[in-house]
Amino acid sequence: RERFNISTAPLSIDVGDKHFIDDENLDREGLLDSMRNSSDAPKTASPGPGPFLDLYRKYDNIFVVTLSKELSATYQNAMLAKKMILEEAEDKLIKVFNSFSATVGETMIAYKLGELIEAGFNRDEIIEKTEKYIEEMQTLFVLDSLDNLIKAGRMGKLKGKIASFFNIKPVLGATPEGTITLVDKARGSKRAIRKLIEKIGERGENLEEKVLGIAHCNALEKAEYIKGKAAEKYSFREIIIVETAGISTVYANEGGIVLAF
């Protein structure tokens, strides 16, 4: 964040009677503990236009990266705030990017933007190259727990119980439209991780030019294993590992892994 001067308009999460703000002060262990002990699905809320307006007033040349607009109202609120601020100060330069992704996908887009800025590209070039990057970016993830999908009604209880009983792990991905889809499935975490690593080769192109981002939710050992195997098998320019933040933790749940490249 310091290197690229990144600020955040945080989302919020409610689990039962507990309220969490997804910023740098988030109690991630507290969030995980609340999710484990609640029969209700976590409820997430996007920031309204207000937090974006506060940030827009601080800077004149701004790039914004949001969660997929198919998953959250964050993009729409960032755009509404842009319209409002331009009525106050029409000379501000604000570009809002829909990530068509989530979690480490957003991180990788911000990383790309930072690299382009440091490399000295002009604003139009940065926008063009970033839009191309988003269009080509792949997001894949493996869930260790189906609890939140079941609680949220995204997976029927019976189907979820059968999957859990047979230890079936879904390999999921982002569609070009920014929704979540089933890519593959495997019995057991180890097989699911192997499939996840295989999918990199099936979906990725020009990997020597790209950075692989790996986000994990309390699963550093698993993330390190994937990093090692991906380094052996593919020619990524760089591989980075990050911990999931709040919303990412809700998506991934404990043991979850998310890749973006």
Descriptions of predicted regions:
Residues 47-88:
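Active-site cofactor/cluster-binding pocket
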Residues 29-47, 176-191:
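Acidic/glycine-enriched edge-of-secondary-structure segments
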Residues 1-14, 71-74, 78-83, 95, ...:
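Mixed-charge interfacial surface used for oligomerization/domain docking
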Residues 1-45:
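N-terminal glycine-rich anion-binding loop in soluble enzyme alpha/beta folds
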Residues 31-32, 36-39, 49, 60, ...:
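N-terminal/domain-start segments enriched in small and hydrophobic, helix-friendly residues
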Residues 43, 64, 96, 213-214:
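Short catalytic-loop micro-motif centered on adjacent basic/acidic residues
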Residues 89-93:
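Rossmann-fold dehydrogenase core element
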Residues 3, 37-38, 58-59, 65, ...:
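Structured helix-beta-strand junction loops
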